[in-house]
């Protein structure tokens, strides 16, 4: 074999030059070029040095000064639900695709033309705060009659942007057996016309879950596969290369036609075996339904599974177990120490007759899961719920210590004292700074200006030494991580631009870390991803603007030009 051929065997597969390579290493150093071979980074440095690693068959990309970041890690997303609640499987009813009730009605009417009689029509994303009719008249809300006007034979179920409210037509109510006589379930609400007592078509929280969701026809395996492929294509187009599926398992079997069910894990595995995953997937297992998950469910699910955190591969792995502690602030179901402005303080969404019983049940679940070698990600938004989760984490780790890296999902109102406790015990937070941008305008009226300004205290978490990653919670929020960075840097609201809690703003570098290396830490994978360093997975995204210097109000509009996963180009918009 000649010298040239021997060199080609050692040469890089891909060389990227003339770029601004933001490595996100410990020094946040900037390089010009990077070389990749067999899906891994083999060199990072100056153009003249990296070019020497190119052989006859090496692909060379000249970025002409464009910026490169490590692949983005969305650490709390419902990816298959995101894909399954978007076209072609569902109707697009989120802003800015629709701006009025009439727009939504028109979109549903078009969908009716493409489905069989009796087939369910679903959608996600409507928001009264952006519907023209609701803005013009605050007493105007979406109704079943709106949807009945275009769909009398097909049941319709449209989730609002938060996923905690649904808007349905009369056919859906009929199939669910919901009438004016239906009692309102604990932890939920059936909105009824005050004049007639008839359901208006809006159902909230456990009323939506327990009455309507369970009668929606389960999607086929092929439809779930299509949902995953749709999601991955969209995620790659914006630079996302890793995700944590926020909840999949038997507890999600009745959500949106099975989009959080156990079969979804099997479908992911099929795609992994076929080499068709273009996003690295970490899965949190869900063993019981929202509001009904008990210690008995956890015992059955965890004790006999025979798995633990880390089972799987670089592409598909079990991350841990998902629990729900409370609800969300906009619904006043987040469990708070201090009452909401209008009264009430929320509560734990766990079986039990009293706060004490529910608290004890939560602690038992945490201790049991930790003992069996699973990382825990617990949905907790209110300060009292977060404190309860941290109580459980500390008790569990004291009884059975290991490098669990348990974390709170959301962590909206984490208190200064709780931050100290989290730092001492290596407990993290998975935040969604983009949701702060979406909701901060109306939080003042719910919890008062002081607490509203504190919500998602990113600077306090950083200063306190707490690891926090960032994500979208899609389909609750579109997974535009650039919007999330802008929100973390500016803390301006979506509707009015009002700054909420300026003292909690963080730098661009810190925000970028939350979407890259901090996500890798949460995944127990910081040694192989999260930064552009020798030996790590070659997951990169290329941007058309310099995210470190562009006007901060333009960060959200930066285009992704290219996404690379494992050294392969999976998206290219150059």
Model-derived features: positions:
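Short loop/turn motifs at secondary-structure junctions and domain boundaries
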Residues: 6, 23-27, 313-314, 521, ...
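Divalent metal-binding segments
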Residues: 10-17, 22, 26-303, 319, ...
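Basic/polar N-terminal segments that are highly enriched at the extreme N-terminus
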Residues: 1-12, 573-574
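Short helix-capping segments at alpha-helix termini
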Residues: 273-278, 310-311, 396-403
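Structural alpha-helical segments in enzyme catalytic/regulatory domains
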Residues: 309-311, 318, 423-426
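Acidic, glycine-rich loop-and-beta core segments that form the ion-binding/anion-interacting portion
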Residues: 306
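His/Asp/Glu-enriched, well-ordered alpha-helical/loop segment
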Residues: 226, 367-377, 384-406, 410-411, ...
